[in-house]
Each structure stands twice: as structure tokens, then as C-alpha cells.
């Protein structure tokens, strides 16, 4: 088997984005400053490897503030953002909290709030029950914001009260799918207000474009990331739509389906924005044990975005 040659096309950019790096650093610096345990409301980012690593360092993950028995301990809000009510609850409990919401998600929160204050009813394009969507919808009164998830919902959206409407989007959506939804809304509501700068973040866009760039050359495509990672799931969809029908999401090298790889000559590899590079390294190392590997990294753009952590942790 070792004699078989495999060409790996390594998609770049891939892996951690600036918002994820910032969120992880916030947890680590909080543990250094306050000691363990430091509580984190929801997984700081959607990756099991990252969450397990932070647990080992002293982070305790909870879904509700009520689960924290010792309210004198600090709590961190995840990169996905939280509804306003959660911030109010933390203040009412007199808790020390650190907000690790990605600055690009916070930008969407501010947009939605400002547009609503200017008299607009808000449409959020996103996936129901995703923490980021819950957080964005939780910035406004329930009656001021509606969720649209797909083209059908955009076609059937009823602005029966003829309100002024504006849209914002989740930051981790499929760029192409979202374009189609926006096109439908603009055709139906000619005066709909859109964000000054699109809400899908730079990292989501870059990773999707990088995958799209090489997918048609690949017999198989592996996206390394967790099943609950929205941006990782979107990368699988992009690979399939861009010419590689056998695209799969795997968490780690332990999930490599070797029985399928035997017939492949070219394998594409990328990773979600919450997946550390060590998972890609482990994936390639495992393949090297069985095949003769030739690796080509195909980079479409350099990323140099850095987000500062809160001053209180410096």
C-alpha cells in the first residue's frame, strides 16, 4: 500500500481565523489572570480538540449561567456572541465576565441595532439555532427581527405591514447561497437596505474561495473540523458544488476512510476556521504511514488580520 502515490492539494488559507485565535487567547489569559476554574458559556469555538485542550487548562464549559454555582468566578462569552439578556443576567449576578464575541459578529450586532433604531425591521439571513443567530436575534425585541434561512423562505417572506426592511447575515454562511437569497430579497423589495460592507467574514469567504479553486482537480476532499462548526460544514458543501462529489467532514485522522482512498490519486484538504493546524498535520502524518505523499499548498490570498484582546486581560 505504501507504494501508492497520493497527491495532496492543501488549500490555503485554512484553519484558525483571527476571531478564533482571539477567543482562545481570551480563555487562556483569563485562566492566567483569575486562576482555575474559569467558566465559558457555550463552547468557546466549535472544535472538540480546542475545547478539550482548554478544559485541561482549567476552563469549565456551561450552557447557562445558572449552572455556575460559584458566581464569584469569571465567565467568558463564546466567539459566537450572546443575546443581550445574557449580559444583563451576568450583571444581575454581579459576575465578572469577559466577552470573547468575534469583532465581526459584534459588527453585525451593531448594524442590526442601528438600523432598527433608524426605523427598519430587520431580516437576518442565517441558520436557526446556531449560537451566532441566537445572539444576533437577541440584540433586538422579538417583533423587530425575522430569520430567513433559504431561498424558499426569501421567496415567501411576507412584509404585509409594508415596513422599511433591512437585512444582515450570519458571518459563516455559504457565500454563493447567500448571494442567491439576497438577490431574491432585492428583486422583491427594491428599497431593502443592505449592510455597507457584507457581513460574511473575510475568513469564511477566503476559505470557501480556496476550496472552490482546487475542488475540481480532486478525487476526494477532506475538510477537517467539528460537525457543529457551521463554516466547516459550508466548506464541504462548497467542495461538492465546485466539482468534487466525494467531499467529507472529519474531526481528526482517526476518521480517515482508508477503504475509500485506494482509488484516489488527488486529495484536497482544508480545515474550518475553528480547527487548529495540528489536526491537519496529524491527518497528513497518518497518510504518510500508508502512502507515498506529494504535497502542493495552493494559496489564493495571504491573511494578516489580528484582533486585540480586551484591555482588562493585558
Residue ranges and their predicted role:
Residues 1-267, 271, 277-314:
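The feature marks the mature, well-folded catalytic cores of soluble enzymes
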Amino acid at each position: 500500500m505504501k507504494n501508492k502515490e497520493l497527491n495532496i492539494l492543501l488549500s490555503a488559507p485554512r484553519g484558525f481565523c483571527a476571531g478564533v485565535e482571539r477567543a482562545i487567547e481570551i480563555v487562556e489569559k483569563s485562566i492566567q489572570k483569575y486562576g482555575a476554574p474559569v467558566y465559558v458559556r457555550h463552547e468557546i469555538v466549535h472544535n472538540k480538540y480546542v475545547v478539550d485542550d482548554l478544559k485541561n487548562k482549567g476552563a469549565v464549559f456551561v450552557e447557562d449561567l445558572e449552572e455556575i454555582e460559584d458566581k464569584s468566578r469569571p465567565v467568558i462569552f463564546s466567539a459566537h456572541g450572546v443575546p443581550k439578556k445574557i449580559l444583563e443576567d451576568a450583571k444581575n449576578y454581579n459576575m465578572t465576565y469577559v466577552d470573547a464575541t468575534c469583532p465581526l459578529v459584534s459588527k453585525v450586532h451593531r448594524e442590526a441595532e442601528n438600523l432598527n433604531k433608524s426605523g427598519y425591521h430587520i431580516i437576518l439571513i442565517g441558520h436557526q439555532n446556531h449560537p451566532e443567530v441566537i445572539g444576533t436575534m437577541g440584540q433586538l425585541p422579538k417583533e423587530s427581527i425575522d430569520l430567513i434561512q433559504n431561498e424558499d423562505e426569501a421567496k415567501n417572506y411576507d412584509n404585509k405591514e409594508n415596513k422599511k426592511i433591512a437585512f444582515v447575515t450570519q458571518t459563516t454562511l455559504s457565500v454563493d447561497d447567500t448571494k442567491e437569497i439576497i438577490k431574491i430579497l432585492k428583486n422583491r423589495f427594491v428599497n431593502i437596505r443592505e449592510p455597507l460592507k457584507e457581513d460574511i467574514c473575510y475568513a469564511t469567504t477566503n476559505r470557501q474561495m480556496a476550496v472552490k479553486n482546487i475542488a475540481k482537480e480532486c478525487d476526494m476532499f477532506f475538510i477537517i473540523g467539528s460537525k457543529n462548526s457551521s463554516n466547516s460544514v459550508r466548506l464541504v458543501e462548497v467542495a461538492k458544488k465546485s466539482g468534487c462529489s466525494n467531499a467529507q467532514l472529519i474531526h481528526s485522522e482517526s476518521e480517515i476512510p482508508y477503504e475509500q482512498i485506494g482509488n484516489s490519486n488527488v486529495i484536497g484538504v482544508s480545515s474550518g476556521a475553528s480547527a487548529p493546524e495540528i489536526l491537519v498535520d496529524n491527518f497528513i502524518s497518518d497518510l504518510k504511514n500508508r502512502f507515498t505523499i506529494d504535497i502542493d499548498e495552493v494559496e489564493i490570498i495571504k491573511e494578516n488580520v489580528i484582533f486585540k484582546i480586551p484591555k482588562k486581560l493585558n
